């Protein structure tokens, strides 16, 4: 805000012809100046338009109201930037700014022509945009009609007319395209233009396919974006993120192309293999049959089809591929599956298949088809693609979108902060001016009245003054006083003003961001503000007038859950500390009102930043009251004649009328100026001063009123009717009720009721008995009654005014009202949905459950921020839905027989808008491939592919990832750890604490009673007793020191269980904010804080609160240790107590004690004397065992045994019975393993002792697993092996591999990270379950018992409802026929448990369509379903997917990533303690240290070799090779299945040419580079590829002849793809992304190992439980749990949650007729093929949660983390490449790699580098100033140069020195040769020596000259005077010479940098070397000087 415009109408000036002439004059002036100024640098900041006055924004507050005659009229531009540009502005009633070009529109209409003026008036009118908006919406509604009636044609014309009118108005008002702000200069208008042009084209010109052109009308929907302001920014963010995605997109396309080529080579033509019938009729051949096949029936006649499948069964020729059933053979014939669209036959289809794999859509189908056709070994291909392609690339897209959003967000926050600051400054300036003006007015009035009374003897001052002060101002003042009194008298104690203070306009982002404070300016100003001995409390000003304190700044600066009142209670005026937290949060302290505990109204007001004057000058003056007044450089008022109005003394302290505000004084100035008499004598000036005061007052009033939430009458009404204080009795009654209702126990009771009510609702199921139904109904009545009573009582206790100010209460009242309404309307048909509202009660739990609260907040915040994004998404969905309907609707209708046998529309079609919308929504969910096949079949491939890909990329990848990015950004680690609890939420904790205390008290009394009764002396140690005393003390005050001192005295942490709550939660009164450090800065300050009586403060004390300086040592131990591990927070001994003891076992070779101290103390027999006798022998045995166990070989042996025993489990598959020998070997092996593990356990017991063994979690794991083996061993020996329990125990052996966890470091790290994350994962899991519970109960209400249907069991089809309307009819049919069945869906909503399972299938989008179809077809309980009868049930699923799936599942990602980062912080050691600055240096040095100068490959001496060398090392050669690689790639893409012989030959020869070319390259390089060729990695890679290509070419025939496996041949052909990978070398962006992947690899390998372990265990479980289930759905002859390999194949598929519904379905068959419990399996003793539903559900759900949600998300977390690191690396000022470049240039200057270059070459070297290291010539002075060390021969070491150059880039820094020594040690180790050299001098010293030498020489010359002159002068003595002059002149000339040489010198000495120290030389040597060096230097100087 450079200029504060004068408030009121002065700012606005009509735009007239004079204005235009003035502008033209300014332009002419500017042009005349321009030629002179052209030389100015472009870097200088050009003036920019003001962001507040941009077109389209609201006019800033400060300009006040627009004078009546100026609305919608052309005005002069307010923005100074446009002063010399031909523009003018127009303001409409809503104060929106419109900017127009002042040149004639269309070359005809000047700004003053009536037509243009009318157009402008229409354009700026708010109704005009409303009209357009309504037109667009109506038009959209018409667009959704699929068969519009004829009359809509006319409506269409109307729309076109309106749009044309709109464009005409715009063109007339703005001009067409010449000049700024004209019609076509706004890109959004291009859209309108195109739409209108197309509308007319389609009308008047016949363009053929009209429907395609009509789809262009859809773009009109995009116009909504240009009309709604917030949307433009989101679209901006989207476009930004798409730009940022370019690199990732290129990488994705590149990777997919490579994978597609691999797929093409491996699986070309494989998917055409089918099972063909053997028995052909007479003389039929395959060819003849293929020619006759036409319809589906013909195909089914000859090929083998599975029931319900559309495609023939695939098979393969290799042993591990799918086999055909008997009577069929495998042939390659016919088309590919899925209408022929799924194949690897050409590059394009292979690319589509890979894209589908990457997006993981229905990929299990592709996986199964491919493995069936090619063989199971190719699973490896899928593993690589899923892990690299899918997980990595998709998440990179997420990472990029998230970063783009984050950057955009940061920018917005910064801008908003700036605005708030500017606004605040303006307000403060206005206030100050207002005060000054008022003071002047008062003084003037007083002066007038005194003069009058002198003259007339009468006092008429009052009337005179009232004339002067305007009436409105007076009214305002009165109103203000009234309001203040009213406000302060009303019950503000509850902090309700907080509710009023948030201004309506603030949005959540701003609110979140502002408490960050405006760091930079503030710190500086606060230092200036508070004088040393003065409390900041006294910085007062009108800023804190009472009126302001209740409603404040535009955006309230809310500190995190803390209010100032509590802070200022302990700040006493003299010594309060201005804590760092406050300066960080940026609020000024405010005096606290004594009658309020929590003065939240002040807390709101005070969060405004300090006033920063516009001109940057701030003077603070302390007046006689010690009040700091801020005097701003230009705050004084300007008078018309340019005089400053001085400040005024106001004699009496002006306090507000209201008594309660007497602490908040107005600013008084005691040291001010008096008004000059002549000034007051001037009546004009006086009048001016007073009116000025009133104007200012009005402006400030208006500003503040504009920020009120509600109009004033509302407050009057509220006070009258919503506060009930009728009579004293009523008030007493009210207090009683208040006391009861607000009691923590009542809260607890209500919470228990909520839980019970939820349970009651969750108990509904189908079928239910009548009694049960009645119980539930009565329960509902009771709970409704309880909640209604609670609401009524609270209303009485709090008054409606108070009650409705609390969010939770509003929520409660809504739910209670709805429940009551539902009770009355229970019997009305169709209103059963109201029952679902009861479910919202579950959310009341959030009040007392912080995580749920946080989740709701996160969703709330996101929805706030997502509002605009959701709108954009909705617009996109709408547009694509309409496009789909317009383009493909007809085709679906006409060609429906192609995709459906009975020629009816399928469920997913685009014939009408709703179905079209559903398809687009399904694509957004990531399911696009199946609907796309249908679309391609009916409407042609090209259009469908384009539309689907656009929806997929725009909708799914970009917008949905932006959703996720928003979610992740609302997750900051604070949210999870320090959940801000609302004080009321603690009521529950208080209640629980009371109960605990009661129980403890009862226990203690009982214990004491028993002890007394048995008259034993209690053996409770003193410490324990003291700790208990401490715990039960009921003192109300505790000082922050005494606690720590008591803790030191009593060692109360010894009693671990007592204080387990220590450090768990923060007491609400003790500290209001966890980051506050209010006493830490002042150790002597002791603060006493009231604590609620009877509440123990120990359990609420936070560890951080103890860390005040006085007890820092104790607290350090406490804090450091508590963060180290999750499990051991309590047993932290105090310093000096257990430290040594703990450290011992680490170092000693001796075992620890066997038993715990408690055992030894109780049972003296455990005490053994180890000095003598048996004890000594025992001790020696223990020591021997200890040595054995600790030996590394022992550990390796055990690991081997674990691996072998785990491996043995993998053999126990379905075929074990047939392999007798293996079975016997395994049985013996199992016994041996068991014995070995028992032995290991015993050894460890003896070696470590029970205490150590059983306090280690990993040992417990070992112990339990060994127990299982032991029990099964004993059972087998006793012959009980067939018992049920023993069998189930045997399956637990699958856990054996878990023992490997603790043995592998990598996996242990991951597991520890996971274990650390478990609490928060469980928390989120619970919250998700609660969230889903609501949907599950709703599902039960909607669908329970409605999924039954009557089916024909022969083909599984459903009888039409017209034939079989209900259950009874179906049963009648069943009696007649065997093939009829009344069957329920396996996964349904019959109870809450099954509801959860159904929701999980919907949320993972697996098997969800079947559930959805059943729901949409459902009619009623026991009724036969009808096709799409309840069509709008789709909406239930859409809503669930948005909230249940997008939000909650992504929340998991959020939690895991968050946790991951927190853990990293905990373990991250050094990184956290480095500043950003240090990190920069550290990273640069890290890179720098890893490099060293290499000798360039020498150019060979031989002439021919030399020429080849020049050719090969030329950049053009590299580029041409890259081009060849690309061409090679293209030729490989051309290859396809079934190509002609001719084409095959052409491609073969092309390939031969490429092989020759690449071989040629290889040979040329070998000739020229000789043995150096193999020193470069890429060359080796090329060499290998060339060799394999040649071998492959020659061996192709051999392989085909002898080894008939085409697979091997194919794999060899893949080698050619290796050449493509060389492209990566060239692209920097891609390299960054791959660098991120390389950085992730170690971590990803660990996670992969863990995933493999989980899969291994689950595979063994699966084999033992589900090996024999019936083969249907997803389980068949290849994909099953019969063998270990098959189980792994299935589990890999479910890792991405793909197809788990199909694998679960057969396991849910539990009884006939679904399965046969008596079925015999040949070769096995197992009977039946039924599954176990509960085990199956647990198995799959747990596996999905562990693998899909946890492990896979950790994978994502690692990638996101490393991506941000990699991008940081690439944006750092110095990257790897810069150092590489340095060394590349170095090689040219130092061909022998001596690591030195001569000083003379340095200048050229510095100029030869690329930026940022480049130092362009002239660079001599800069280089000398670097003070580089030189060795003999004036040579400088490369690292010294690099170090100095690096420092120059990164900037001088104090932290540099601390790191320097470390760095150099690293360089020394990397470059040993550096150690040996000793610098003699430095460049700076050398220069100084040179300069000294020239100075000495010149002095000597001057001296000689003088001598000569003297001699001459003595001869010519007569002309002495003249000679003297001459001499002086000469002297001066010499002095000048001398001075001229000095700038170099001063310039050189100005650098104070010292040369680097070389720490690897040991200190004494170093000192000696320093000494030698100085001596040498001195000698050198002496000798030089003597020479001279």
From Swiss-Prot:
The lineage of its organism: Eukaryota, Metazoa, Chordata, Craniata, Vertebrata. The gene is SCN9A. It comes from Homo sapiens. Residues 347-363, 916-928, 1395-1405, 1687-1699 dip into the membrane without crossing it. Pore-forming subunit of Nav1.7, a voltage-gated sodium (Nav) channel that directly mediates the depolarizing phase of action potentials in excitable membranes. Navs, also called VGSCs (voltage-gated sodium channels) or VDSCs (voltage-dependent sodium channels), operate by switching between closed and open conformations depending on the voltage difference across the membrane. In the open conformation they allow Na(+) ions to selectively pass through the pore, along their electrochemical gradient. The modification Phosphoserine is found at residue 1490. Residues 474-486 have a biased composition (Basic residues). This is Sodium channel protein type 9 subunit alpha. Expressed strongly in dorsal root ganglion, with only minor levels elsewhere in the body, smooth muscle cells, MTC cell line and C-cell carcinoma. Also expressed in vagus nerves within the head and neck region. Isoform 1 is expressed preferentially in the central and peripheral nervous system. Isoform 2 is expressed preferentially in the dorsal root ganglion. Residues 1137-1148 have a biased composition (Acidic residues). Coiled coil: none annotated. Belongs to the sodium channel (TC 1.A.1.10) family. Nav1.7/SCN9A subfamily. GO terms for cellular component: axon; axon terminus; node of Ranvier; plasma membrane; voltage-gated sodium channel complex. Residues 1-125, 173-185, 228-241, 403-745, 797-805, 849-865, 968-1187, 1251-1252, 1305-1317, 1458-1514, 1568-1576, 1628-1640, 1760-1988 are cytoplasmic. Glycans are attached at residues 209, 283, 1352, 1366, 1375.
């Amino acid at each position: 805000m450079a200029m504060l415009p004068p408030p009121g109408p002065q700012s606005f000036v009509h735009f007239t012809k004079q204005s235009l002439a003035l502008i033209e004059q300014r332009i002419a002036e500017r042009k005349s100046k321009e030629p002179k100024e052209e030389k100015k640098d472009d870097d200088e900041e050009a003036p920019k338009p003001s962001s507040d006055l941009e077109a389209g924004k609201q006019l800033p507050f400060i300009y006040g109201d627009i004078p009546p005659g100026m609305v919608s009229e052309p005005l002069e531009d307010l923005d100074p930037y446009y002063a010399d540009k031909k523009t003018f502005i127009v303001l409409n009633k809503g104060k929106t700014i419109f900017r127009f070009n002042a040149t004639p529109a269309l070359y005809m209409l000047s700004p003053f022509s009536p037509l243009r003026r009318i157009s402008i008036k229409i354009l700026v009118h708010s109704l005009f945009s409303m009209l357009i908006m309504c037109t667009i919406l109506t038009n959209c509604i018409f667009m959704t009609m699929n068969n519009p009636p004829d009359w809509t044609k006319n409506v269409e014309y109307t729309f076109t007319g309106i749009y044309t009118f709109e464009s005409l108005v715009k063109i007339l008002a703005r001009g067409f395209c010449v000049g700024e702000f004209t019609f076509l200069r706004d890109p959004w208008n291009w859209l309108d233009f195109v739409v209108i042009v197309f509308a007319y084209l389609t009308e008047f010109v016949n363009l053929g396919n009209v429907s395609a052109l009509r789809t262009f009308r859809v773009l009109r929907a995009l116009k909504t974006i240009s009309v709604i302001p917030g949307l433009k920014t989101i679209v901006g963010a989207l476009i930004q993120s798409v730009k940022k995605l370019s690199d990732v997109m290129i990488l994705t396309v590149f990777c997919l192309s490579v994978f597609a080529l691999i797929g093409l080579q491996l699986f070309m033509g494989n998917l055409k293999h089918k099972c063909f019938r053997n028995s052909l009729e007479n003389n039929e051949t395959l060819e003849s049959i293929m020619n006759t096949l036409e319809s589906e029936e013909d195909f089914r006649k000859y090929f083998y089809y599975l029931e319900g499948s559309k495609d023939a069964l695939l098979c393969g020729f290799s042993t591990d591929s799918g086999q055909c059933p008997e009577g069929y053979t495998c042939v390659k014939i016919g088309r590919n599956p899925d209408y022929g669209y799924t194949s690897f036959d050409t590059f394009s289809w292979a690319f589509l298949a890979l894209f589908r794999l990457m997006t993981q859509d229905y990929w299990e189908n592709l996986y199964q088809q491919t493995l069936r056709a090619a063989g199971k070994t190719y699973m490896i291909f899928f593993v690589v693609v899923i892990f690299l392609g899918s997980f990595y690339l998709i998440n990179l897209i997420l990472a990029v979108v998230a970063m783009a959003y984050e950057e955009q967000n940061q920018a917005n926050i910064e801008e908003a902060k700036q605005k708030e600051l500017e606004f605040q400054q303006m307000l403060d300036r206005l206030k100050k001016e207002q005060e000054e003006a008022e003071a002047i007015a008062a003084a003037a009035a007083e002066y007038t009245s005194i003069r009058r009374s002198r003259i007339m003897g009468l006092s008429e001052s009052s009337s005179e003054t009232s004339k002067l002060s305007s009436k409105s101002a007076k009214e305002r003042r009165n109103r203000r006083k009234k309001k203040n009194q009213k406000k302060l008298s009303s019950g503000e104690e509850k902090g309700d003003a907080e509710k009023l203070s948030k201004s309506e306009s603030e949005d959540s982002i701003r609110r979140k961001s502002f408490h960050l404070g405006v760091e930079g300016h503030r710190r500086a100003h606060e230092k200036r503000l508070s004088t040393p001995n003065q409390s900041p409390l006294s910085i007062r000003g009108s800023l804190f007038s009472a009126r302001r304190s209740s409603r404040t700044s535009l955006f309230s600066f809310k500190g995190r859950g803390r209010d100032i009142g509590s802070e200022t209670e302990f700040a006493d005026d003299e010594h309060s500390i201005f804590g760092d937290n406050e300066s960080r949060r940026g609020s000024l302290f405010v005096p606290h009102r004594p009658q309020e505990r929590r003065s939240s109204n002040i807390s709101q007001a005070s969060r405004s930043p300090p006033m920063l004057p516009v001109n940057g000058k701030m003077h603070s003056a302390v007046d006689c009251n010690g009040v700091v007044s801020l005097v701003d450089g230009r705050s004084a008022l300007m008078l018309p004649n340019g005089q400053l109005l001085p400040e005024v003394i106001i004699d009496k302290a002006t306090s507000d009328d209201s008594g309660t505000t007497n602490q908040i004084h107005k600013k008084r100035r005691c040291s001010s100026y008096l008004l000059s008499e002549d000034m007051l004598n001037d009546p004009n000036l006086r009048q001016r001063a007073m009116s000025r005061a009133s104007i200012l007052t009005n402006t400030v009033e208006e500003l503040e009123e504009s920020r009120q939430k509600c109009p004033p009458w509302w407050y009057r009404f509220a006070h009258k009717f919503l506060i009930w204080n009728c009579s004293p009795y009523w008030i007493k009654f009210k207090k009683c009720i208040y006391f009861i209702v607000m009691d923590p126990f009542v809260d607890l009771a209500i919470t228990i009721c909520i839980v019970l009510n939820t349970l009651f609702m969750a108990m509904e199921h189908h079928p239910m008995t009548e009694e049960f139904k009645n119980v539930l109904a009565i329960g509902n009545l009771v709970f409704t009654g309880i909640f209604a009573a609670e609401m009524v009582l609270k209303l009485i206790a709090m008054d409606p005014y108070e009650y409705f100010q609390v969010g939770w209460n509003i929520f409660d009242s809504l739910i209670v009202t709805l429940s009551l309404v539902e009770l009355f309307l229970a019997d009305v048909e169709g209103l059963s949905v109201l029952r679902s509202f009861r479910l919202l009660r579950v959310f009341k739990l959030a009040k007392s459950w912080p995580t749920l609260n946080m989740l709701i907040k996160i969703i709330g915040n996101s929805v706030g921020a997502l509002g605009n994004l959701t709108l954009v998404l909705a617009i996109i969905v709408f547009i694509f839905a309409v496009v789909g309907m317009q383009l493909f609707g007809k085709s679906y209708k006409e060609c429906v027989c192609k995709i459906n046998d009975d020629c009816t529309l399928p469920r997913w079609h685009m014939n009408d808008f709703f179905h079209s919308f559903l398809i687009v929504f399904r694509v957004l969910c990531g399911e696009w491939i199946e609907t796309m096949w249908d679309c391609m079949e009916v409407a042609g491939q090209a259009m469908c592919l384009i539309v689907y890909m656009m929806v997929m990329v725009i909708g799914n990848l970009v917008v949905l990832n932006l959703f996720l990015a928003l979610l992740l950004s609302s997750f900051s680690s604070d949210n999870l750890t320090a959940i801000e609890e609302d004080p009321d939420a603690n009521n529950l904790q208080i209640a629980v604490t009371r109960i605990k205390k009661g129980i403890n008290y009862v226990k203690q009394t009982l214990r004491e009673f028993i002890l007394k009764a048995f008259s034993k002396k209690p053996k409770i140690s003193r410490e324990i007793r003291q700790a208990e005393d401490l715990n039960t003390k009921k003192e109300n005050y505790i000082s922050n020191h005494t606690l720590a001192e008591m803790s030191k005295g009593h060692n109360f942490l010894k009693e671990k269980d007592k204080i387990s709550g220590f450090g768990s939660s923060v007491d609400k009164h003790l500290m209001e904010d966890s980051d506050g450090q209010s006493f830490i800065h002042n150790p002597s300050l002791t603060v006493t804080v009231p604590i609620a009586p009877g509440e123990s403060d120990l359990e609420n004390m936070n560890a951080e609160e103890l860390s005040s300086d006085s007890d820092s040592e104790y607290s350090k131990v406490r804090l450091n240790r508590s963060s180290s591990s999750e499990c051991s927070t309590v047993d932290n001994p105090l310093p000096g107590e257990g430290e040594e003891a703990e450290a011992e076992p680490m170092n000693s070779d001796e075992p620890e004690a066997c038993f715990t101290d408690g055992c030894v103390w109780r049972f003296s027999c455990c005490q053994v004397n180890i000095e003598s006798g048996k004890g000594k022998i025992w001790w020696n045995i223990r020591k021997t065992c200890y040595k054995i166990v600790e030996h590394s070989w022992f550990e390796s042996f055990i690991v081997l045994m674990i691996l072998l025993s785990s491996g043995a489990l993998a053999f126990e598959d379905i075929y074990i019975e047939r392999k007798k020998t293996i079975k016997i070997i395994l049985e013996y092996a199992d016994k041996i393993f068991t014995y070995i593990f028992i032995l290991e356990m015993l050894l460890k017991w003896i070696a470590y002792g029970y205490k150590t063994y059983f306090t280690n979690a990993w040992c417990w794991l070992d112990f339990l697993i060994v127990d299982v083996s032991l029990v099964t061993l004993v059972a087998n020996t006793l012959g009980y092996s067939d018992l049920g329990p023993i069998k189930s125990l045997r399956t637990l052996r699958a856990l054996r591999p878990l023992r490997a966890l603790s043995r592998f470091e990598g996996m242990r790290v991951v597991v520890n990270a996971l274990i650390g994350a478990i609490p928060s994962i469980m928390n989120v899991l619970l919250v998700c379950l609660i969230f889903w519970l609501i949907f599950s109960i709703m599902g039960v209400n909607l669908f329970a018992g409605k999924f039954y249907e009557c089916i024909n069991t022969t083909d599984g089809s459903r009888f039409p409802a017209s034939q079989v309307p209900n259950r009874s009819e179906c049963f009648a049919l069943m009696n007649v026929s065997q093939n009829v069945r009344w069957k329920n869906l396996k996964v349904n909503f019959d109870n809450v448990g099954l509801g959860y399972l159904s929701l999980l299938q919907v949320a993972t989008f697996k098997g969800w369509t079947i559930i959805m179809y059943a729901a949409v077809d459902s009619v009623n309980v026991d009724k036969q379903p009808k096709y799409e009868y309840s069509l709008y049930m789709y909406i239930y699923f859409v809503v669930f997917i948005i909230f249940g799936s997008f939000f909650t599942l992504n929340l998991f990602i959020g939690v895991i990533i968050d946790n991951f980062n927190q853990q990293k912080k905990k373990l991250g050691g050094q990184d956290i303690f480095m500043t950003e600055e240090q990190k920069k240096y550290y990273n640069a040095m890290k890179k720098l240290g890893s490099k060293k100068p290499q000798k360039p490959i020498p150019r060979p001496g031989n002439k021919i070799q030399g020429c080849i060398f020049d050719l090969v090392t030329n950049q053009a050669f590299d580029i041409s090779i890259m081009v060849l690689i690309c061409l090679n790639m293209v030729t490989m893409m051309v290859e396809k299945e079934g190509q002609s012989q001719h084409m095959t030959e052409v491609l073969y020869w092309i390939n031969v040419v490429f092989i020759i070319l690449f071989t040629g390259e290889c040979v040329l390089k070998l000739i020229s580079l000789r043995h150096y060729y193999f020193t470069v990695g890429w060359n080796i890679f090329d060499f290998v590829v060339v060799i394999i290509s040649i071998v492959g070419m020659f061996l192709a025939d051999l392989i085909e002849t002898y080894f008939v496996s085409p697979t091997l041949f194919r794999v060899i052909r893949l080698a050619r793809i290796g050449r493509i990978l060389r492209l990566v070398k060239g692209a920097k962006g891609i390299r960054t992304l791959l660098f991120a992947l390389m950085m992730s690899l170690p971590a990803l390998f660990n996670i992969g190992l863990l995933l493999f372990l989980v899969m291994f265990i689950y595979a063994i479980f699966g084999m033992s439980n589900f090996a024999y289930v019936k083969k249907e759905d997803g389980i068949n002859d290849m994909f099953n749990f019969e063998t270990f390999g098959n189980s792994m194949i299935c589990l890999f598929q479910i890792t991405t949650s793909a197809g788990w519904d199909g694998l679960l379905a057969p396991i849910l068959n539990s009884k006939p007729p679904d399965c046969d419990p008596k079925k015999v399996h040949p070769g096995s003793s197992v009977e039946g093929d039924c599954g176990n539903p509960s085990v199956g559900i647990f198995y799959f759900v747990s596996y999905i949660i562990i693998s899909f949600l946890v492990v896979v998300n950790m994978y994502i977390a690692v990638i996101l983390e490393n991506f941000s690191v990699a991008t940081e690396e690439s944006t750092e000022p110095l990257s790897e490449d810069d150092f590489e470049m340095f060394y590349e240039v170095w090689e040219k200057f130092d061909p022998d790699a001596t690591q030195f270059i001569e000083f003379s070459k340095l200048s050229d070297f510095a100029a030869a580098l690329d930026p940022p290291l480049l130092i362009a010539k002239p660079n001599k002075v800069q280089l000398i100033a670097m003070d580089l060390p030189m060795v003999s021969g004036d040579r400088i070491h490369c690292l010294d140069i690099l170090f100095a150059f690096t420092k120059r880039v990164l900037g001088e820094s104090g932290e540099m020195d601390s790191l320097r020594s470390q760095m150099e040690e690293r360089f020394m180790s990397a470059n040993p040769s550096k150690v040996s050299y000793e610098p003699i001098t430095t460049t700076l010293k050398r220069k100084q020596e040179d300069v000294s030498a020239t100075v000495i020489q010149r002095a000597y010359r001057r001296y000689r000259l003088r001598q000569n002159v003297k001699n001459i002068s003595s001869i010519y003595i007569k002309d002495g005077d003249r000679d003297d002059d001459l001499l002086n002149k000469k002297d001066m000339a010499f002095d000048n010479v001398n001075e001229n040489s000095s700038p170099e010198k001063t310039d050189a000495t100005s650098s104070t940098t010292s040369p680097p120290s070389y720490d690897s030389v040991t200190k004494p040597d170093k000192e000696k070397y320093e000494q030698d060096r100085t001596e040498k230097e001195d000698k050198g100087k002496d000798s030089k000087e003597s020479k001279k």
